[in-house]
Amino acid sequence: MEGKKEIDFSKKFNSLMGENNTYEFFLKMQYVMPKYSKKKDPIFFSFLIFAIEHLAKYKEDESISSLFIQSMQLYLKNHPDKKIENPSYFMNTYHKIYKMIPVKSDKSLFKYNYLELCDANGISEDDILKENIYYEFAVDSRENKFLLEGYKFAMKSMKLDIINDVVKDILETDKYKMDEKEKKIFVARTCLEILVNKDKKMALDFILPFINAKDNYETNEPLCNMAYFICLLLNDKNVTFEKFKEIINMYKPNIEKVDILLKKYINKISFDNYNQLVFPEANNPLSGFNIMGMMKLVGNLSNLMRGN
């Protein structure tokens, strides 16, 4: 028996296919999406890809993001078996759509909406990491010069190559008006953040290019030296908390000049490795410190999220 004929969506919506009708096209897609979201995979995804491809042709990035999120919410609602049990299914769908958006486009809205949808549907951080989503987001943000957004995703990806690339770009640009000392503090903070994420070897590999061992390390920014020595200690299983604290106390005057956040990084690292705190007085809730310390150094929240 002959199979069902594929739907020619371009013929079906021909009157809205012109360049001057993109908004009307988008509204029509929104209107008919509830109907198509009830269809089986081939029809639904054929329709969704048709709509996204047309909007991508005219670089309608916000419309793409909005339509994708709406369509997936409806689809997951109508097909609950696809909801949480198979996160890779949703990831694969995302990949198909994401690659249709022009490379030189602001995909920020798409990224944040996508991550919200993952969270709402029980897709874990581990699943996102396995699919290299954060890495892809970071690469894209960097290519589009949204460096602080790229930094955020690079740090979440925990891939050293993209972390190095984004940090290098941030240090070389005049956009954030950092002097040389602030740049070195930013490097030290990044190293500590990698340690907070519990990758001791990566932290050491990251900080090494910024360390000059000549003249007893005196030509380096003190906080870079501190980050380097912390990495060395943590990579040695025989080092005690007392030795760790001794190194921190050597640099306490330098730490005091930065902000309370640096102490929270050190506390988190100390607690994870030795189950003790170096700065008990700074032990307020540790949530929300990940990117916020860098924000104080290089820009406000809106700049951070949009990379402006």
Language model features: what each stretch is:
Residues 1-85:
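Eukaryote-specific detector of the first structured module of a protein
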Residues 1-4, 12-15, 31, 46, ...:
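Extended alpha-helical solenoid/rod scaffold regions
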Residues 3-11, 23-27, 128-132, 144, ...:
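Amphipathic alpha-helical repeat elements characteristic of tetratricopeptide repeat
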Residues 16, 36, 55-56, 141, ...:
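Hydrophobic side-chain positions on well-ordered alpha-helices
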Residues 20, 59-60, 76-80, 98-102, ...:
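Helix-turn/linker elements and helix-coil junctions of extended alpha-helical scaffolds
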Residues 23, 31, 36, 58, ...:
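Sequence-level detector for tyrosine residue identity
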Residues 68-198, 202, 207:
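Eukaryote-skewed repeat-based solenoidal scaffolds used as protein-protein interaction platforms
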